[in-house]
């Protein structure tokens, strides 16, 4: 019995063919085979916005050959990517090939490994027409907005300008932010910053003026004159530790990546634009040759909003953590992350397909971009399974001539997941530890320096790739 399997890319076709073996002909569609013709609107507005599709120019011979292959095969499987676009491509292929839409010939692979491919082939289903319609709605909106607004913008503003369903909204965000920046009026403020030692300790630590002893409100200094007045009040003052408060806090790991968070973190850490990130991720998903392991997909499908991971993947990750770091780095109860309630949960978060294959093991087999993205995905996934970081916090309150200074810091008591990975902020920096020296109430401190520092309030930052991806996607929590 001959079986035809249609996927999207040649690399994916080659790898899947290797897992399926004889009896399967695996061909690549090279993406979409039908689309709305560019020469006209191709949407019948008067008849419920019906789209008018045509075979993409240059693919006529491919479609002709594909029809012959489908007619000769005993069964046809549609194995395009597991997202809206992939579902739509399968629907277009089924339409062109005359396949029964109710037949279970649609298969999806969350990962391009032998296990992932064979599991997908064991669970065929009918084409999800709701998923197809979601893609069609987006495509029709793209066409309506682009074709209706672009000529107007080109005529009224500048020749060659265009509008789009996504780009116009993004442009609005950028313009609104720019208007905020232009309207912003900076306000002057000052801080009083000091450095102390606690003899015989030589290492100094920093503290900032917080307020007055008899006034719990935070002090606000708006001019150099006010700053100089406070510095004058503190001349010759004795600095005494009034209180030392200690506590503990737990720092939890962030979830494994979804599409938007992968793009954000790659932008922060690697200065990658989204296109570059997704290109490398697509290649890692479709499969690469890894020395000692053959050809395999290194990560799961990279277009996802789900934070779910399979129990098999969790077990494999836990085994790696136990073997590499020890059992104390595994939490007593497994950690589960909650996805947003309105997402498609058909596949998992972005994770390594084989957690035991470390980034260093693939470094010599993949491109630089592929290595960097795999390292991000692998570290984030493994860290998400690990124990919390435990920190001891300390707050020192120092009094002098009626003024109060505060110093805060922490020491790491157990590094937990941070032994492997820490998420960076929008400035590309991780939180730095600032341990404080041992002090107790009543200790007299030695002043090393004290300065008044001028500052100005800052306007909102202009959008970077990272901030633009982040704006519509609030972070999800864990349980």
Feature map (PLM): residue ranges:
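Toprim catalytic domain recognition across nucleic-acid enzymes
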Residues: 1-467
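Conserved small/polar residues in nucleotide/adenosyl-binding loops
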Residues: 469-478
């Amino acid at each position: 019995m001959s079986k035809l399997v249609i996927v999207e890319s040649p690399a994916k076709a080659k790898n899947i063919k290797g897992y399926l073996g004889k009896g399967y002909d695996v061909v690549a569609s090279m993406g979409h085979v039908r689309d709305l013709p560019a020469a006209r609107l191709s949407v019948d507005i008067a008849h419920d916005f019906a789209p008018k599709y045509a075979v993409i120019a240059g693919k006529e011979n491919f479609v002709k050959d594909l029809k012959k292959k489908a007619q000769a095969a005993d069964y046809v499987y549609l194995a395009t990517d597991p997202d809206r676009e992939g579902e739509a491509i399968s629907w277009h292929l089924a339409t062109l090939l005359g396949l029964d839409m109710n037949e279970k010939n649609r298969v999806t692979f969350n990962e391009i490994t032998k296990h992932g491919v064979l599991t997908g082939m064991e669970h065929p289903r009918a084409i999800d027409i709701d998923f197809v319609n979601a893609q069609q709605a987006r495509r029709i909106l793209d066409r309506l907005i682009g074709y209706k607004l672009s000529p107007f913008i080109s005529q009224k503003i500048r020749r060659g300008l265009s509008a789009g369903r996504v780009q116009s909204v993004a442009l609005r965000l950028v313009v609104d932010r720019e208007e905020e920046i232009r309207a912003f009026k900076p306000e002057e403020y000052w801080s009083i910053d000091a450095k102390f030692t606690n003899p015989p300790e030589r290492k100094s630590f920093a503290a900032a003026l917080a307020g007055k002893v008899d006034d719990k409100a935070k002090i606000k200094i708006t001019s150099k004159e006010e700053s100089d007045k406070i510095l004058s009040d503190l001349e010759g003052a004795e600095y005494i530790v009034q209180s030392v408060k200690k506590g503990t806090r737990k720092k939890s790991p962030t979830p494994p990546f979804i599409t938007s968070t992968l793009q954000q973190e790659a932008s922060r850490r690697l200065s990658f634009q989204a296109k570059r990130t997704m290109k490398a991720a697509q290649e890692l998903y479709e499969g690469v040759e890894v020395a000692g392991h053959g050809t395999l997909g290194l990560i799961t499908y990279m277009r996802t909003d789900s934070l779910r991971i399979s129990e098999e993947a969790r077990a494999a990750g836990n085994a790696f953590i136990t073997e590499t770091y020890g059992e104390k780095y595994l939490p007593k109860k497994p950690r589960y992350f909650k996805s947003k309630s309105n997402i498609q949960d058909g596949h998992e978060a972005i994770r390594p397909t084989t957690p035991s294959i470390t980034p260093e093991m693939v470094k010599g087999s993949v491109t630089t971009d592929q290595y960097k993205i795999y390292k991000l995905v692998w570290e984030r996934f493994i860290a998400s399974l690990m124990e919390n970081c435990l920190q001891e916090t300390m707050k020192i309150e120092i009094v002098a001539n009626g003024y109060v200074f505060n110093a805060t810091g922490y020491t790491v008591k157990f590094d937990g997941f941070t032994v492997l990975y820490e998420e960076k902020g929008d400035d590309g920096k991780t939180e730095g530890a600032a341990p404080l020296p041992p002090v107790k109430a009543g200790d007299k401190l030695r002043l090393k320096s004290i300065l008044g520092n001028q500052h100005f309030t800052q306007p909102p930052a202009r959008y970077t790739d990272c901030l633009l991806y982040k704006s519509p996607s609030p972070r999800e929590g864990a349980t």
